[in-house]
Design a protein with these regions (language model features):
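Short, polar/flexible loop-turn hinges at active-site or ligand-entry regions and domain interfaces
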Residues: 24-28, 132, 151-156
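A broadly conserved sequence feature marking short terminus-proximal activation segments
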Residues: 137-193
Length: 217
C-alpha cells in the first residue's frame, strides 16, 4: 500500500515546496558553517521558527564560535535567547558548544554523541552537514504523514517516534535521493498548512489523495 501511494505523495509534496520555497525559506537553511548549523538546530527546539528568526542575526553577531558561548555569563546567554522559552536551552547550548570545541563533527557518527540532540535533530544535522542518513521528520512532518497515510494523528507526546513513521520512512521517504529537500517540504507543509488544529485542507497540495482530507467535511 505504501509503495503504491508514495510516488504521488512525494511528487505533489516536492512540487508544492519547490513552487513555494521562496516564501517558505529561512536564512539558516543556507548556512554552511557547522557551528552555526548545530547551534541553530538547538535554538529551534520547541519554539516557533519566527522567534528564532527575530534573534538570529544578533545572536550570531554576538556568538561566533563555541568559545563565545562557553565564555558568556549565564545572564548574557539567557538574555540572548529568553524569547525562545525552554529553561534548559542555555544548558543545551553550552553542552553543544563544549562538544564542538572538544570533539568537533567530522562524520555522521559524531552527531550521535551530540548532547541534547533528539532523533529529528540528529537526522537533520546529518543531512545538512554530510548529506547522509534518513529523512528528518519533526512533529509537523509526522502530522502530515499520519493524516495522509492513516487519516488521523495519534494522541501521543512524540508521534515522530511511532513505528508507523519508521515504516513510512523505510518504504517511501528514504527512497528519495534529495532527503534534505523532502525533510524541509514535510515540515513546512505541516507548519503552514497541515496545522495541529484547523488544518487548511482546501489549500493543501495533497488533499485529493489524503485520507484525512477525504474523511473531513
Amino acid at each position: 500500500m505504501l509503495e503504491e501511494e508514495c510516488p504521488v505523495f512525494g511528487k505533489k509534496l516536492l512540487e508544492w515546496y519547490l513552487n513555494n520555497s521562496p516564501l517558505l525559506d529561512r536564512k539558516w537553511r543556507h548556512d554552511r558553517d557547522p557551528f552555526r548549523i548545530v547551534i541553530t538546530e538547538i535554538l529551534l527546539i520547541r519554539t516557533r521558527r519566527e522567534a528564532v528568526e527575530r534573534i538570529y542575526d544578533e545572536f550570531f553577531f554576538r556568538f561566533k564560535s563555541p568559545d563565545d558561548i562557553l565564555n558568556a555569563t549565564e545572564e548574557e546567554l539567557r538574555k540572548a535567547i529568553y524569547t525562545l522559552g525552554m529553561r534548559k536551552r542555555t544548558e543545551l547550548l553550552r553542552k553543544a558548544a563544549e562538544y564542538l570545541k572538544l570533539h568537533g563533527i567530522r562524520s555522521p557518527s559524531d552527531i550521535e554523541e551530540l548532547p541534547g540532540a533528539g532523533e529529528y535533530v540528529k537526522n537533520i544535522l546529518k543531512l545538512r552537514l554530510f548529506n547522509a542518513g534518513s529523512v528528518a521528520v519533526d512533529r509537523n512532518g509526522a502530522r502530515v504523514l499520519f493524516r495522509y497515510f492513516y487519516g488521523y494523528v495519534p494522541e501521543v507526546e512524540k508521534p515522530e517516534k511511532r513505528k508507523e513513521i519508521a515504516e513510512i520512512k523505510e518504504k517511501c521517504l528514504d527512497l528519495y535521493e534529495d532527503k534534505l529537500t523532502l525533510s524541509y517540504a514535510l515540515m513546512d507543509l505541516g507548519y503552514y498548512v497541515c496545522k495541529p488544529r484547523k488544518p487548511e485542507c482546501g489549500r493543501c497540495p495533497l488533499k485529493d489523495t489524503c485520507k484525512y482530507a477525504k474523511d473531513t467535511p
